Amino acid sequence: MKMLYDLAKKRKTVRRFKKEKPPLEDLIYSLKVANEAPSGMNAQPWRFLIVEDEKLKGQIRRVCERSEKTFYENVRGRLKEWLDEKRFTWRKPFLKEAPYLLLVFSEKSAPYSRESVWLAVGYLLLALEEKGLGSVPYTPPDFREVEKLVNTPSELRLEVILPVGYPDDPKPKYPRNEVIVRYNTF
């Protein structure tokens, strides 16, 4: 039963991808795994959109970078210090360079839809790792322009964009903090 733990230990954030395009079947497999996630009232409120069109990926990158640039220009205080320390930038080349973008949506009217979608994303990330694929959960400051680009139905809300491909990112996974467990009370 150690296999799941090993996958979780191995999985890391990937922002750089090889140009080689993974088989679509590996993404479909990963989405089937995500579909097995628990959901509030068994609503299964997730919807997935695979984007592989180069022009559309470029448009998504442009609208995301525009909202990121505005965000970075206006951020202040401790958050700005943290972003600078980590060398984060408004540029998001992985949105164009990844062979695929997986857009994950929630049904607005479903009970506990956001919480449920993020459970599915956790399953999805582990399934991608199992297939040797990397990703980073990316949440732009403003999803509305992306929703327009992909003709999102009004009953859905974009929750996260996952660039997906074979990792070409040599940096190691950051160490995990020790698990701290309390019993009954804090």
Swiss-Prot record:
It comes from the Bacteria. It is an enzyme of class 1 (oxidoreductase). Its cofactor is FMN. It catalyses: 2 iodide + L-tyrosine + 2 NADP(+) = 3,5-diiodo-L-tyrosine + 2 NADPH + H(+); iodide + L-tyrosine + NADP(+) = 3-iodo-L-tyrosine + NADPH; 3-iodo-L-tyrosine + iodide + NADP(+) = 3,5-diiodo-L-tyrosine + NADPH + H(+); L-tyrosine + chloride + NADP(+) = 3-chloro-L-tyrosine + NADPH. Keywords: Flavoprotein, FMN, NADP, Oxidoreductase. L-tyrosine binds at M41, E68, Y72, K92. FMN binds at R11, K12, T13, V14, R15, P38, S39, R176. Changing M41F: Increases affinity to Tyr and decreases affinity to I-Tyr. The keyword Transferase does not apply. One of its GO terms (biological process) is tyrosine metabolic process. 3-iodo-L-tyrosine binds at M41, E68, Y72, K92. PANTHER family: IODOTYROSINE DEIODINASE 1, NADPH NITROREDUCTASE. Catalyzes the dehalogenation of halotyrosines such as 3-bromo-L-tyrosine, 3-chloro-L-tyrosine, 3-iodo-L-tyrosine and 3,5-diiodo-L-tyrosine. Activity towards 2-iodophenol is weak. Homodimer. This is Iodotyrosine deiodinase. It comes from Thermotoga neapolitana (strain ATCC 49049 / DSM 4359 / NBRC 107923 / NS-E).
